[in-house]
Amino acid sequence: MQKRELIYEGKGKKMYATDDANLLIAEFKDDLTAFDAQKRGNEAGKGALNNKISTQIFKILKEKGIETDLVETISDTEQLVKKCEIIPLEVVVRNIATGSLTKRLAIKEGTVLPFPLVEFYFKNDELHDPLVTDEHCLVMGLVKSEKDLQTLRHLAREINSILFKFFEERKLKLVDFKIEFGMDKDGNILLADEISPDSCRFWDADTNEKLDKDRFRQDLGSVKVAYEEVLRRILS
């Protein structure tokens, strides 16, 4: 597969065209960002770890019937993925209160929520990715129909159900996570982007030690060491 021109660069990945119009190459970066990219850093090996972790998680989900954009891993930092039109929503699933939820609603940090909370955020850097309702999504044309919203919410809950149990068995609390979806050329909704410690919060089940990008946000120590531990538990 021939890598061609760079078509998009985000905070954590670069996307390249290939000689197949239906496939792209996603390259994971070592860059670290937080607080709308106001805080920046870099840790060698982080991109390769995210590639390995996300690949494993997508394979687990695929085995459970969740359709994804992943075709195969082609190098330490690269994946071959299906080209799809990314739906401009970040879908966040929360199991335990932390981060912006505690600030917005004054819910005590660490509160176990009575059920998984699914939220939609409009992907827009200038607006700082605001929280949006179903009706906002429809008015703004972020999705094509109410049925698509129902599909996104159903998939998010299903993914959470699968991964919560998987990580619980490996002594990790899946606190919350952000996922993105795309639509392929046939109109099918696919899980896209990544699921990694860059986009999830993982706490050790016994100590509540943070094993995710909050280590960078809060200056808690090496991100790479934490990500290596997450990968070790996934593979255990």
UniProtKB/Swiss-Prot annotation:
Lipoprotein is among the record's keywords: no
The protein's Enzyme Commission number: 6.3.2.6
Reaction catalysis annotation: 5-amino-1-(5-phospho-D-ribosyl)imidazole-4-carboxylate + L-aspartate + ATP = (2S)-2-[5-amino-1-(5-phospho-beta-D-ribosyl)imidazole-4-carboxamido]succinate + ADP + phosphate + 2 H(+)
Keywords: ATP-binding, Ligase, Nucleotide-binding, Purine biosynthesis
Family matches, as InterPro entries: SAICAR_synt/ADE2_N (IPR028923), SAICAR_synt_PurC (IPR033934), SAICAR_synth (IPR001636), SAICAR_synthetase (IPR050089), SAICAR_synthetase_CS (IPR018236)
Enzyme class: ligase
GO molecular-function terms, A-Z: ATP binding; phosphoribosylaminoimidazolesuccinocarboxamide synthase activity
Gene Ontology biological process terms from the UniProt entry: 'de novo' IMP biosynthetic process; cobalamin biosynthetic process
Listed Gene3D superfamilies: ATP-grasp fold, B domain (3.30.470.20), Phosphorylase Kinase, domain 1 (3.30.200.20)
Claim: Glycoprotein is one of the keywords in the record: no
Pathway membership, UniProt: Purine metabolism; IMP biosynthesis via de novo pathway; 5-amino-1-(5-phospho-D-ribosyl)imidazole-4-carboxamide from 5-amino-1-(5-phospho-D-ribosyl)imidazole-4-carboxylate: step 1/2
Family note: Belongs to the SAICAR synthetase family.
PANTHER family for the chain: MULTIFUNCTIONAL PROTEIN ADE2, SI:DKEY-6E2.2
Protein name: Phosphoribosylaminoimidazole-succinocarboxamide synthase
